Amino acid sequence: MGSVLYSLSESANLYPASELFLRHRLQIVEELWESVLRQECGQNMVDLLRQLRDLCSPEGQATKDQAVSAVKLIEQLNINEAIRAARAFALYFQLINIIEQEYEQRQQLTRYSDLEAETAPLNGSENITSSSNHNEDDVIFNRGLGTDFLGKNWTNRGQGKQKGTFAALFPLLSKLNVPPQQIQRLISQLDVRLVFTAHPTEIVRHTIRDKQRQVVDLLQQLDEVENRAKDGGGYPWEAGEIREKLLEEIRLWWRTDELHQFKPTVLDEVDYALHYFQEVLFDGIPQLYKRFKYALNQTFSWLEPPSKDFCSFGSWVGSDRDGNPSVTPEITWQTACYQRKMVLERYIKSVTQLIELLSISMHWSDVLPDLLESLELDQSQLSEVYDALALRYRQEPYRLKLAYVLKRLENTRDRNLALYKGETPTNEDSPMYRSGSEFLAELRLIQHNLTETGLSCRELDNLICQVEIFDFNLTKLDIRQESTRHSDALNEILDYLQLLPQPYNDLSEEQRVAWLTTELQTRRPLISSELPFSDKTNDVIKTFRVVRSLQQEFGINICQTYIISMCRQVSDVLEVLLLAKEARLFDPAIAVGTIQVVPLFETVEDLQRSRSVMRQLFELPLYRALLAGGYKNTEVKVPNTELTPQSPAPSPQSVLTPDLQEVMLGYSDSNKDSGFLSSNWEIHKAQKSLQQIAEEYGVNLRIFHGRGGSVGRGGGPAHEAILAQPGHSINGRIKITEQGEVLASKYSLLDLALYNLETITTAVIQASLLRTGFDDIEPWNEIMEELAARSRQHYRGLIYEQPDFIDFFHQVTPIEEISQLQISSRPARRPSGKKDLSSLRAIPWVFSWTQTRFLLPSWYGVGTALQEFFNEEPEEHLKLMRYFYVKWPFFKMVISKVEMTLAKVDMQMAGHYVQELSDPEDKPRFEKVFEQIANEYYLTRDLVLKITDHGRLLDGDPVLQRSVQLRNGTIVPLGFIQVSLLKRLRQSKNNTATSGVIHSRYSKGELLRGALLTINGIAAGMRNTG
């Protein structure tokens, strides 16, 4: 077929074995892809795709002549041919993604085994500081600029990945003389939390993901067969047979619908997210702990490893109700039950396997009295099990014990199923486990008996580790709701009760805080059991009540975080605390609660205000007492009002980490609000100021990073992003969202999942112990402040002040078509009814710019800010920016993300969208907007190349550069198809013929389906949605 591999096909003998393997895999995929298309669509379709791709250069930049030629080809297609072409390109991208994932997993396996013998300092370890004494010159810094690609491994990124492992980290800490007691203190409090979200939901159907996993499995089988053949083993026909199976599987994939046939429900999204636990993480997390423990022991054998749940998971799927009316209290309850169902089924499977494994007989092994005593108790409680199995297992105590354990698990599962269905359990009196700790105690009893009699069981140890990590809940559920929902609910409640002389929403902030503070010092309830309010207010009240019910049924850990989106002031936090009090989640008399209120600061103004808001909260005695675990743990006097009963009712016991405040920072809305550079700088500043406030008040801080999948929403390599954070703001604690769109790329394969978790953990440790100090250089901060302000001004000048921009956005991008994709239970717009930028969510905003190859939110404004700075002192300021890039992790992270995004931009393709999709009367205006955007792109590109000293974008990362080029050349013809379909779709209301588009008789539904298929394909090619 026309050269899909482009430059990859040249000089094969010059490349190392790892790249030859990748090239071999790409060739196999190319052949399979062509074979499938030939069998399913005919040779004419194969020839067409060759022609379209041959018109596009490897770099993906379509010239004017190429665009004209490609469009002429596309004009001649009927709708079925256009859809087939779009599907073919989409299939190609998804196959390439699979090959890259398989290659990366193979590389991780190879590198991890090699790390034992040789380790190297981590990137960013230069110029670090700790309490130990070491010379800055002892740490070698290598920029890696201008290095010959052929002299390296195929992946420059691979070397960085090698350094993101435990096996490389601990020798580095030793080399830099970091005091072991500091390492131990950090490890003891290590807390890495990853929170799965459903927005944006993965655009690829679950059914298609199943097909992709089959392809992955077959490719791995092919790898094994080929390796055996190299060693002279196996049979010559085996590889051919696997290739035939691959061809069959891809043909089945081709005949499967790519588009969701219905809008997924919230529980569909829950099932999708939990799939990664079922397939990978449930077994993978114990391996992560083992890697940590082993690597630590190799360098610091006297240090204690962290707790097994140092890396834990949370979820918003089924509990995040911000802007999603489909997430109801009932859905959140069902989500918790669903999670428990999954984890119980895994435990049941494991215990069943242990029964087969632990066939130890009392004829040949001793048994301790405590196990025999527990068997007597089990017999009295589960006589049916004893009657059925006592004879069979009369000399096998471990099997009998595990049979009792299995029955209790099954009873627990049956009760949970009834709760899921909303029914009253009929087996309440049956012996079962009320918590994971009860199950864990039984497993430890068995483990103790084995150990004391000289035995061990790896499968049992793994199960114990899983229970310690996942408990009976699998993940913790975070509740999230928008701040005005709480104030509106209180407004209605207080109006009904006639407690205030004026509506609550009319009160000033000072009046609200004063009233809320007073009300939070009494146990007097405001809300009765009956709810005579509107549905929206009742939903808010019921949400708090279901949290209380969840904690009572599943334990407090299931749901103890309540996030307030669009948090702007102190009253936003106190309102949630008051509603929590009404649900008995907070006892004001003793200031003890079982819920942690987390403010989420999203816009630039809110980020700038966050320091003041948190200071005011920390000044409130009741809030400080809540953080401390009650008045008894503070010097604050217990308030004594006439409304506080002298004999309090039973109160919740605080299980919150003492003096820990979690604060969430939003990347998406701040970027949409002020642009990439300003957003990143404001978040960076907010972290520093929040940590300073926390230290001032003796509070521990955990920053929750609301990162998206794309650069425009905070995405990008997590390792580098964490190292770029202000070190003092981490201190061994971090919480990060993992967006639904990136779950497949990070967690579909075990070794990739382990690598991702390992790099995040090592980055947290490194950023906490090894600090550059550059974040505290005031002149550098002043320069960044100036750059951010200039960037923001230029960005907002286009987005919010250019009068033609909103019309430009709606006509030139497929925003309206994206909103019709059945990929998420959440609406694309906030419920304001307006079609302006303020109501549009950040996810479809970024998605639209990605489809049209502008990727505008991830770079616009950066070039102008840099140019204005350079204009002041061109040579000196360029030297300074280069120095920042080399020395300052934050600045390097920002520039690297911009560079990566610019490499994916195709301004010629973007111009084609403008020319073809603009209404004739609007085209002159829109061409001026496009010219402004294009000028900023070229300016930004040129200045980034100057700062990085690269000849081309991504010269410092050849693998990413090749990966982007490999996709760009094929995305261009797919973009042409999308434009043609969108143009005809938007003009389908007119019966007149339209020039320059696909000619055929077709319905609007057919056109929409075709357009949506191209959106799918481009998303796969760009490797993200929003």
From Swiss-Prot:
Disulfide bonds: none annotated. It catalyses: oxaloacetate + phosphate = phosphoenolpyruvate + hydrogencarbonate. One of its GO terms (cellular component) is cytosol. It is an enzyme of class 4 (lyase). Its EC number is 4.1.1.31. Pfam families: PEPcase (PF00311). One of its GO terms (molecular function) is magnesium ion binding. The keyword Lyase applies. The active site is at 199, 672. One of its GO terms (biological process) is oxaloacetate metabolic process. Its cofactor is Mg(2+). Keywords: Carbon dioxide fixation, Lyase, Magnesium. InterPro entries: PEP_COase, PEP_COase_bac/pln-type, PEP_COase_Lys_AS, PEPCASE_His_AS, Pyrv/PenolPyrv_kinase-like_dom. Belongs to the PEPCase type 1 family. Forms oxaloacetate, a four-carbon dicarboxylic acid source for the tricarboxylic acid cycle. This is Phosphoenolpyruvate carboxylase. It comes from Nostoc sp. (strain PCC 7120 / SAG 25.82 / UTEX 2576). The gene is ppc.
